């Protein structure tokens, strides 16, 4: 649904206020104090996340509407994950994130939301367990929580933010900064163009990745396939934080 002109102008004003240009003197004065804010977010996140049961993170577009097939797919994946003993972690917002939290609650499982404060005022969706809705100012702190406490990543169609989370995990596993865990792309048709480019342009034509790097993730279409990949992995390995 298109924004009204009034809503569009208000959105622009919020963004401009959020990104108001700062002089170097103000930046230098604030940088040292920002360390304490970063530390407090890590402490808050670690203390909250270490108390949850094993969880799988589900990623995808915040723009996906409830009547979209991907929304239904995310909800069903989360529902089936809870039936297999996993909780669900999302970015806490609307769209795919909302669908996944909804599916987790429908299944009676743990439903965690790691919300990020944005100029666009993203609000946590209503399907997050009350004591498990966490707010972050810093994307990089939030990423650490996803990486450390997820037993798997399930990645549905999304945009730049979804790709950011996907490639962060792939990079850390590829460089052996963390151990391997299941990464599952859902929607073969959606991901095929990107995967062809990675395989052909990055791999075959330029040798910028190893052919074995393509084995770091799985591609599926159905909820039960995604859950099966995770269950198969943890039939061999122990459930634990990734670092």
Segments from the language model and where they lie:
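Acidic/glycine-enriched connector segments
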Residues: 95-155
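Glycine-rich beta-alpha loop segments
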Residues: 2-6, 11-12, 22-114, 123
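Solvent-exposed alpha-helices and their adjacent loops that cap or buttress functional pockets
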Residues: 49-51, 80-82, 105, 125-128, ...
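Short gly/pro/ser/thr-enriched loop/turn and capping motifs at secondary-structure boundaries
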Residues: 117-122, 162, 190-193
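Active-site/ligand-binding-proximal alpha/beta "capping" segment
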Residues: 137-189, 234-239
């Amino acid at each position: 649904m298109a924004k009204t002109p009034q809503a569009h102008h208000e959105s622009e004003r919020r963004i401009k206020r959020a990104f108001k240009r700062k002089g170097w003197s103000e930046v230098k004065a604030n940088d040292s104090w920002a360390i304490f804010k970063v530390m407090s977010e890590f402490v808050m996140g670690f203390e909250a996340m270490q108390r949850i049961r094993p969880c799988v993170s589900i990623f995808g577009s915040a723009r996906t509407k409830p009547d979209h097939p991907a929304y239904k797919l995310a909800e069903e994946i989360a529902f089936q994950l809870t039936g297999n003993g996993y909780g669900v972690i999302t970015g806490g917002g609307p769209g795919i994130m909302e669908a996944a939290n909804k599916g987790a609650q429908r299944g009676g499982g743990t439903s965690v939301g790691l919300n990020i404060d944005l100029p666009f005022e993203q609000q946590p969706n209503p399907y997050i367990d009350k004591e498990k809705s966490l707010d972050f100012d810093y994307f990089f702190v939030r990423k650490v929580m996803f990486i450390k406490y997820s037993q798997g990543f399930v990645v549905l169609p999304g945009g730049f933010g979804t790709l950011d989370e996907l490639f962060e995990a792939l990079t850390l596993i590829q460089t052996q900064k963390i151990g391997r865990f299941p990464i599952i792309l859902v929607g073969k048709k959606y991901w095929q163009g990107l995967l062809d480019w990675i395989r052909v342009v990055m791999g075959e034509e330029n040798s910028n990745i190893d052919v074995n790097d393509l084995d770091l993730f799985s591609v599926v279409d159905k909820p039960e396939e995604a859950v099966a990949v995770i269950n198969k992995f943890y039939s061999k390995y122990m459930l634990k934080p990734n670092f």
